Curated annotation (Swiss-Prot):
Ranges of residues in domain Pyruvate carboxyltransferase: 13-265
Enzyme class: lyase
Positions bound to substrate: 21-22, 175, 204, 295
Reaction equation(s) it catalyzes: (S)-4-hydroxy-2-oxopentanoate = acetaldehyde + pyruvate
Site (Transition state stabilizer) residue list: 21
Keyword annotations: Aromatic hydrocarbons catabolism, Lyase, Manganese, Metal-binding
Protein name as annotated: 4-hydroxy-2-oxovalerate aldolase 1
Entry's family note: Belongs to the 4-hydroxy-2-oxovalerate aldolase family.
Enzyme Commission number(s) from the entry: 4.1.3.39
Native source organism of the sequence: Rhodococcus erythropolis (strain PR4 / NBRC 100887)
């Protein structure tokens, strides 16, 4: 079991690029090996220290419910590892969707950072997976998703469960892009106070209210040591905090990331953008997700059901927020669409 965390002494914070995982939602999980090699090469060349690669919903996510991968994710992980010179390759897994054998295979393919995600009230389901990952010498990161939905003190208690299980960095994950500045600071500060030297604290933001970079800076100032982003905002919903903009802001305020601003800007424009089906937009649907607190990966599912049943995707997302749906409940969008359809017919 190793206690080492990949963290250079020249960095103030560590940035993880999630374009090849969170971006999979935006691309409907259609990445090719060639695209992964090109993006990893560009990000690695710019100095990005950690690159996450899996199906958008993590290991084992390729399914009827979440969407099938064009290329098996383990092939993509292997290609990423073979391409990277300095960057470490991470993978995401959700207990109950991915299984422990998936962790073993990902490590055998060269990935070295295991990121385990649960709903923010269900950290206990990750205990066995953190144990396995640490036994195998993997660096561990925990994701407390939909962090806007519970107060800071309760989130901190869930973080303690992950840290005690072997998690080396617990993330405040704003899955819906619903948190606003002080709400990020309050949650990060609560985790920092609870965990002390037992684990680092991280932040993962989305752009659904246009605050991805600002919220990430708020997290850094509150004590976060690891920050997620996606180059060119390549992620679910309106996308993640754009790494190139975040790095530029960090340069201007004196926060060291180890990433070359000009190289990451070139990577965003010349390599990542061509792999995107379209830009990640802060449009009406994405805005509704941030406003109503809806899981960002619901966007494409909502658009599909809205078209199928002839209803408003924005109203569909607002009602999903009122029902407090979480990741894994995408199928309930069909029920809501039928409900809206019936209401329209009766009016």
């Amino acid at each position: 079991m190793s206690d080492m965390i990949h963290f250079d002494s020249s960095w103030d914070i560590r940035v993880t690029d999630t374009s090849l995982r969170d971006g999979s939602h935006h691309k409907r999980h259609q990445f090719t090996v060639e695209e992964v090699r090109a993006i990893v090469g560009a990000l690695d060349g710019a100095g990005v220290p950690v690159i996450e690669v899996t199906h958008g919903d993590g290991l084992g996510g390729s399914s009827f419910n979440y969407g099938f991968s064009k290329t098996p994710e383990q092939e993509l992980i292997k290609a990423a590892v073979e391409t990277a010179t300095n960057a470490k390759i991470a993978f995401l897994m959700l207990p109950g969707l991915g299984i422990k054998d998936d962790i073993v295979i990902a490590q055998d393919n060269g990935a070295s950072i295991c990121r385990i995600a649960t709903h923010c009230t269900e950290a206990d389901v990750s205990i066995q997976h953190f144990g396995l990952a640490r036994e195998r010498g993997l660096e561990t990161v925990g994701f407390l998703m939909m962090a806007h939905s519970i107060p800071p003190e309760k989130l901190a208690k869930q973080a303690r469960i992950m840290a005690d299980a072997g998690c080396q960095c617990v993330y405040v994950v704003d899955s819906a892009g619903a948190l606003v500045l002080e709400q990020v600071s309050d949650r990060v500060e609560a985790l920092v106070q609870e965990l002390g030297n037992d684990a680092q604290v991280g932040f993962h933001g989305h752009e659904n209210l246009g605050l991805g970079v600002a919220n990430s800076i708020a997290a850094v100032r509150a004590g976060a040591k690891q920050i997620d982003g996606s180059t060119r905002r390549f992620g679910a919903g309106a996308g993640n905090a754009p790494v190139e903009a975040f790095v530029g802001v960090c340069d201007k305020i004196g926060v060291k990331t180890g990433i070359d601003f000009f190289a990451i800007a070139d990577a965003a424009e010349d390599v990542v953008r061509p792999a995107m089906p379209q830009e990640c937009l802060l449009d009406r649907q994405a805005l509704m997700m941030g406003y109503a607190g809806v899981y960002s990966s619901f966007l494409k599912h909502a658009e599909r059901q809205a078209e199928r049943y002839g209803v408003s995707s924005a109203e569909l997302l607002v009602r999903a927020g009122k029902r407090k749906l979480v990741g894994g409940q995408e199928d309930q969008l069909i029920d809501i669409a039928l409900e809206l359809q019936r209401e329209a017919a009766a009016s």
